[in-house]
């Protein structure tokens, strides 16, 4: 339900402790042996793959395909149930991959889902957009470079759970306490979900038109269809969570009133301030932050009106993306779907090695060259290029002067140092999207109103338990 919440004052709650506790699912059968202990010797890794390029660049539907149930279970059988499961070690959520892979192989989808949801509140999200640290730490990655398709298996389990009706609203026993969650991105939704199931009455405040945060307005639909978010939000609303959208705490509503009206407040507003590129010509028309393009496109697909003069259209344009990460890749895919004349992506750092990197050996997450579905659709990729200035004509962007740089070892053994080479060139561009990462939360509004202390990176200062100086915030 999305509505206003009544006022209630009370005492601070042990919220941190509540977030740590999750119900344990007991298997009907102890898993001591995998169903097919030699499958990894005879069965090769098979990915679902992407839809054909010529088809997918004409729409914003999800690009990743799915395997049939038989093939998916066969892929799950490749898990070796290692004595030391490095997949579990690598997963930030602590997922129990060997357990639910075995259950998937045996066709016990309901049990597999219950094991999965112990550690992952929203596997339908992570099963689509997680970078799959677990797969990079799989022993089969080390031995034959064919890790188990863990991420895809995870997505298959949760989709089967929704399809078969295993995912149902839970009506918890209320404890009489109220909690406000500020922000409805992945962190905010997780906090809301866990506390609601512990009996707290949870209200989520979201500044945008719909819940989801970065999931909704940052990640393109071709990676995460928004019907997936809507499906989960409906479940959460049926469980009693209130969503107040178009409500920016610190602007539309005073932060001090939220603190006063709830027993506890969880701040989950994300690091939304992007890294800027303050060089000559930054003011020119055609220079945008990456999220300006991505959030606008997602709003258009949601049917949210965008003033014509504010719309960014890459059709027939020469597009330059500055920044080589996932956000930059998302800009590439979006520009291609607009019908850009050409798309170039540049990165100031050196090109990562292909395949393996001695600096990040197994089971660490490898710093190697990654080629996304967006790159496959058409993109010129270049490295070791620094941007010197934006070039304009009649206040419109027409190009960017870039300079080749070198990275040399630091004399003190620290990070490599950048050295300019003097080799300059101009890359023609009608549109530039800055995708150089994010810095910290927005300081205006909630942080300033409550005078919250921040650290030297402008993040909210908290103690080891995650609390601010305010005992219930």
Q: What are these model-derived regions, one by one?
A:
Residues 174-184, 315-322:
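Beta1/beta-strand and adjacent pyrophosphate-binding region of the FAD-binding site
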Residues 9, 25-29:
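Low-complexity, intrinsically disordered or signal/transmembrane-proximal segments
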Residues 2-3, 21-22:
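Intrinsically disordered, glycine-rich low-complexity segments
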Residues 38-65, 94-106, 111-120, 147-151, ...:
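Beta1-alpha1 glycine-rich phosphate/pyrophosphate-binding loop at the start
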Residues 283-316, 409-473:
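FAD-site-proximal beta/loop scaffold in flavoenzymes
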Residues 72:
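Short phosphate-coordinating micro-motif centered on Lys-Gly-acidic
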Residues 173, 178-182, 230-279, 388-409, ...:
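Feature captures the FAD/FMN-dependent oxidoreductase FAD-binding
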Residues 77, 89, 95-172, 237, ...:
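Glycine/serine-rich phosphate-binding loop and adjoining beta1-alpha1 elements at the start
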